[in-house]
UniProtKB/Swiss-Prot annotation:
Family: Belongs to the MinE family.
Function statement: Prevents the cell division inhibition by proteins MinC and MinD at internal division sites while permitting inhibition at polar sites. This ensures cell division at the proper site by restricting the formation of a division septum at the midpoint of the long axis of the cell.
Organism, as annotated: Wolinella succinogenes (strain ATCC 29543 / DSM 1740 / CCUG 13145 / JCM 31913 / LMG 7466 / NCTC 11488 / FDC 602W)
Keyword terms: Cell cycle, Cell division
Protein's recorded name: Cell division topological specificity factor
One protein family per Pfam: MinE
């Protein structure tokens, strides 16, 4: 181990980097291709619109090796 490796660490091998990128792409594809996801998003949007005056609604799906997540961000408007 060289002197600089102690401070900056070793660079990842290209195989490890490629493997990490592939895992990320596969996880994203898995999250996006859930068969019920589009209908679930539509239903969530309907419920949010029914009960709020949201200025912005954003729904994001994500997946990693252990868990699938659905993140909903709602910006509520001021009450009139």
């Amino acid at each position: 181990m060289s002197f600089l490796d102690k401070f900056f660490g070793k660079e990842k091998s290209s195989a490890k980097s490629a493997s990490d990128r592939l895992k990320l792409v596969l996880a994203h594809e898995r999250a996006v291709n859930l068969p019920y996801l589009e209908e679930m998003k539509r239903e969530i949007l309907e419920v949010i619109k029914k009960y709020t005056h949201a200025e912005k609604i954003e729904i994001k799906a994500d997946s990693n090796q252990q868990i699938d997540t659905l993140e909903v961000e709602i910006v509520l408007g001021k009450n009139s």
